[in-house]
Amino acid sequence: MPSASDHSFSFPILIGDIGGTNARFALLVDAASEPTQLPPVKTGDFATIEDALQNGIFNKISVRPRSAILAVAGPIKSDEIPLTNAGWVIRPKDMLARLGLEDVLVINDFEAQALAIAAPADQDVVQIGGGSVRPRSSRVVLGPGTGLGVAGLVFAQDTWIPVPGEGGHVDIGPRTERDFRIWPFLDPIEGRMAGEQILCGRGIMNLYRAVCAADGVEPLFKDQAEVTTSALSGDDPAAIETVTLFATYLGRVAGDMALVFMARGGVFLAGGISQKILPALMRPDFRAAFEDKAPHSALMRTIPTFAVVHPMAALSGLAAFARAPRDFGVAMEGRRWRS
């Protein structure tokens, strides 16, 4: 039985990024190997994660994992971990009993994204604008997706320490004359405008409808994919403005997070939305909003911003941690279960 202070995990290690619709897994056979991608699992196809792993993965592979490290979108407060946007409840004790695992660690999904930005490969990121990375300096990752995820990564005592939080729910307010025209038409949450009300998939639609309402025109599009596609092709003025404003507002919030963490190591934009609208993020609006932080605009110009283009960034972060857990200050108390 490992001691309570032991930070190592027994190989093979199953790593998993569990979202609202899809759960993606990979297998690390040993510390020197690259993760082997496993078939993705749709959460709606299985009643429990145990069923999904047994029938969707374990029955199809010859190597049996001894440990599991999972990233989930949901609060980790007890032996039962409900997922925010899916019907599963993760019960690590059941995983130990039913799947023959020896060790299960569950962390926040954006902790995994933060782990991935400690040492990203050049081909996994695209720089937006100027600035340069200061080694071993704090970093921030933001991810517009189902919601707006935010996490920091701080280097202290020769260790990268992920700092999860709820930064996506910070206040966001109007600054320009155009903002003040649009803001009354935005759908708030409990009387206030949080970043996540705009900077996520449904937030794109919230912003698009507000732009249309401010101009007295009827919305043409019904979902955010139509809005972003039309904007990038230059077909519809309201869609173009929506994505331009989205990039601007994302730049403002990203700049705020950079100031909070003094993120001289860089600010990273993760997730599918950032990848899809990358052409818009590469235009001046995002970076101008990011740098517009008087009295610290000169400082902001030195902080680099990147889009993460790795297709499985969270799994990449989990793999880095699984190989060398002592290189990272991941809190395990109350989040690790062993047989």
From Swiss-Prot:
It catalyses: D-glucose + ATP = D-glucose 6-phosphate + ADP + H(+). GO terms for cellular component: cytosol. It comes from the Bacteria. The keyword Kinase applies. Keywords: ATP-binding, Cytoplasm, Glycolysis, Kinase, Nucleotide-binding, Transferase. ATP binds at residues 16-21. Belongs to the bacterial glucokinase family. This is Glucokinase. It comes from Sinorhizobium fredii (strain NBRC 101917 / NGR234). The lineage of its organism: Bacteria, Pseudomonadati, Pseudomonadota, Alphaproteobacteria, Hyphomicrobiales.
